[in-house]
Amino acid sequence: MQKKALISILFLISCLSLNAQWDYRIPSPKPLWTSDTLSVTVIGDVMMHSRQLEYDCRRFFARSEHLLRQADVTAANMEFTLAGEPYTGYPCFSAPDAYAQYMADCGVDVFLMANNHILDKGIQGLERTLQVYDRMQDESGILYTGCAADAESDALHNPLIIKMNGIRLAFVNFTYGTNTGDPSLPVPVVKRMDRETVAAMMKKARENADFVVALPHWGEEYQLRHNAVQEDWARWLTEQGASIIIGAHPHVVQDTTHISGVPVVYSMGNAVSNMTARNTRLELAVKFKAVRDWRGEKKIIGPDLVFLWCTVPGMLEDNYSTIPVEEYLGKSELWKTPSDYDNMTETLDRVKKETGIE
């Protein structure tokens, strides 16, 4: 809660600064040879399928929330709406409000909203989701980006700029499209993957932040390698000033690379879901540090890639549970169904081999 309160205060200060004609600050003494550092973690698709609705969501990240709490700022791709009852899973997701609150309680500070399911319940569903997130922002400091209720909110949230630890960090979140509805409608705003829209966000981010995190929702589902469209966009985003690019949507981990020195994680995969298709239960948590040293030079340290595994009910315990793979290697005796441990290790080896991730 203290982390979120601080982030919220700093976000509000940054909003005031962006809207002010000048930003006067009294300089404070600072020791020589020090660096400003902001640690960030991003996780992939947080989903709520129909079967998940039957279980207590407050256990989903019980075994991995320590990873979410470690960072100064943690962001997650929230791939569902909060459209109210009746709650539904695929193909049109509507989760309980408590699910979003649980993710906040686990340590998630920023909700990434631009994805293909955000209009699953129409304009009304998106509007209600934004109302819930706005209330959470007011009450507990949760922030969001990728969508907005109106032009004023759009200016504040897209890009989302956070000032913390002496660092200004911008999140630029956008999606290739939506499964239903029309994301091009003027309000509520869904940030689309077109060059004009994204270029405007990137320009504002460059001008007002030290580091720019580009978060595209893109790519082909279930493919372990990125496609030509993703690569073209990644190259363009580096030209537009991205400091790091972290993608979502394919529901599996994809390969990583560097383009002109900029780290690119093409897809993180599913953080939690009921999906059991090949490779869909393995995910990456992406951890990095944004650093400005005493000379004013800026750099991204990392990313460090942490593999997570989503166990479904009856495998490790009687609920869904996302676990850090490395912490559970060699502990097959913990599983109710040992074959799931074998599935985890085999999937890990296969994905590492096919993506080239060490």
Model-derived features: positions:
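Acidic, metal/ion-coordinating pockets
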Residues: Q21-E358
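Bacterial Sec-dependent N-terminal signal peptides
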Residues: M1-Q21
